[in-house]
C-alpha cells in the first residue's frame, strides 16, 4: 500500500456470532436500563442471553438472563 491508502474489508480471522457468544465466552453487556454486566456466556437462544456474571474483581455474583430487547451492546474480549 502507498501512503494514504487504506486496506479495505474486515480483518482476517474476524469472529462469527456463534463463536463469540459460545458457552464460556467472556463478554461485557450494556443493558438499556443503564447497567453494564461482565460475565461468561452460559447460553443464548432467540429470547436472550444467560450470563454467569462477574464483579470487577472477577468473582462470580450470580446468573442473569437478559432478553435481547434489553441489550444495547455486547462487547467481546479479543478472540
Specify the residue positions occupied by each region the protein language model found.
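Ser/Thr- and Asn-enriched, surface-exposed coil loops between beta-strands
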Residues: 45-47
Amino acid at each position: 500500500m502507498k501512503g494514504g491508502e487504506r486496506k479495505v474489508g474486515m480483518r482476517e480471522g474476524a469472529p462469527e456470532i456463534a463463536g463469540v457468544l459460545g458457552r464460556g465466552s467472556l463478554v461485557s453487556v450494556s443493558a438499556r436500563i443503564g447497567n453494564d454486566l461482565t460475565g461468561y456466556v452460559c447460553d443464548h437462544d432467540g429470547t436472550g442471553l444467560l450470563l454467569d456474571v462477574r464483579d470487577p474483581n472477577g468473582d462470580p455474583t450470580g446468573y442473569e438472563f437478559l432478553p435481547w430487547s434489553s441489550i444495547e451492546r455486547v462487547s467481546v474480549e479479543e478472540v
